[in-house]
Design a protein with these regions (language model features):
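Charged, low-complexity intrinsically disordered terminal segments
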Residues: 1-386
């Protein structure tokens, strides 16, 4: 059973209303309501948009919006949306909507994925987070449903996200998009500061805006909470997280015990020993598959599309919103407490009992695979459940 939290997380920060959407049905209803309320424009970007009941309903709402004169633009990642039939999107195009696909599969930029998730309506309201357009992300029932988060934003911060979408859309639609131009777009739109700031990441070596920001926040923090569906960062990042405890602070990690990709679970378990040795508390979420991406460093909250692994930190296109507000951070930490209550703690003794030679070998191999391959590729590699 999933433990709910109270009161609801619905805050105003710097003139922006922020409302957390932890429930799948709540996400679905909010998405449809937001699309149906659009008057001028709808910008949609998703890594995965599937041709199931949820995807069909969302496409219908977008098609209706286009038919009533709303400018609708949809940007999808070809690898994540590879199962969609071209004819599925025809009604949207016929109604006057537009769409394009990020990154042809056969390309010298094969490893880069547009892993972002966002809906921007009228340049004023937005939905961001980790959930894709798929029936298992937009429900709270069934063995295949995902535990995830979206954040609804209503306020001036959305205008910057709309501008970012426009630049990414134009870059994707260009017949010969250059990676160096993409890097400039990411850097340009990550320059803001203040209580609410956007941080993006992509194929940028050592100056990737979101990783740079989250490292800075971790190094300054006395308390860090990480809820990450996929967790396989570098040894340097593990040392930084452990350093929070070593200097007298607290650090918790909540990651998945269930997934449709067993390699990602094994890869996370490869990191546990280093974290536990430094005093980090580690938990595995039990009731459902976990897909959340939430990071809290003292009063700074990071929420968006990025996992805490190599691909999200240094390769994929990702978007994160950084909110620095004490009350909001405490509310989000209370939310994490609820996730911890539904998790099993992996103590040093528990980890030691599981860390057989065979398992450690499998964990190490999985860590290598998820670092070098796309999620949809490693999902097809059957390493078996433990």
């Amino acid at each position: 059973m999933i433990v709910s939290f109270s009161p609801p997380i619905d805050y105003e920060v710097a003139g922006n209303r922020l409302r957390l959407l932890p429930g799948g049905l709540e996400r679905f209803e909010t998405l449809i309501d937001t699309i149906e309320a659009a008057q001028e424009s709808i910008r949609v970007l998703f890594y995965m948009f599937t041709e199931d009941a949820a995807g069909t309903r969302v496409l219908h709402a977008l098609t209706q919006a286009a038919a009533r004169g709303v400018e609708v633009r949809v940007l999808l990642d070809e690898f994540g949306c590879g199962a969609i039939r071209p004819a599925f999107l025809d009604p949207l195009r016929d109604a006057g909507g537009m769409y394009c696909v990020f990154h042809p599969t056969i390309s010298r930029r094969y490893l880069i994925r547009n892993h972002q998730k966002m809906v921007v309506v009228d340049g004023r309201r937005a939905i961001i987070g980790g959930a894709n357009i798929n029936e298992h992300y937009l429900t709270d029932e069934g063995p295949k449903h995902w535990r995830d988060l979206w954040l609804f934003i209503d306020g001036p911060a959305v205008e910057k996200l709309a501008d970012y979408f426009d630049d990414i859309y134009l870059w994707t639609a260009h017949p010969k998009p250059l990676v160096k131009k993409l890097r400039r777009i990411i850097a340009k739109h990550s320059r803001g500061s203040g209580p609410i700031a956007w941080r993006f990441s992509g194929p940028i070596a050592n100056s990737n805006p979101w990783p740079v920001q989250v490292v800075k926040d971790i190094l300054a923090a006395r308390r860090v909470d990480i809820v990450a569906a996929y967790f396989s960062p570098s040894n340097a990042m593990l040392r930084r997280i452990g350093g929070v405890v070593e200097r007298g602070g607290e650090a918790r990690l909540v990651t998945a015990s269930k997934s449709d990709n067993n390699a990602t679970i094994a890869a996370a378990r490869f990191t546990y020993g280093r974290l536990l040795k430094r005093g980090v508390r580690v938990f595995e979420y039990q009731p459902a598959k976990l897909h959340t991406k939430l990071y809290i460093c003292d009063d700074a909250v990071h929420i968006g599309s990025a996992n805490f692994d190599f691909r999200s930190l240094y390769l994929n296109l990702e978007m994160m919103l950084r909110v620095e507000d004490r009350a909001f951070a405490q509310a989000m930490r209370d939310y994490v407490d609820g996730e911890v209550a539904n998790s099993m703690e992996i103590t040093p003794a528990v980890h030691k009992s599981k860390a057989t030679l065979w398992r450690k070998t499998k964990w190490a191999l999985s860590n290598f695979l998820v670092t070098t391959m796309d999620y949809t590729v490693t999902r097809r590699i059957n390493l078996g459940q433990e």
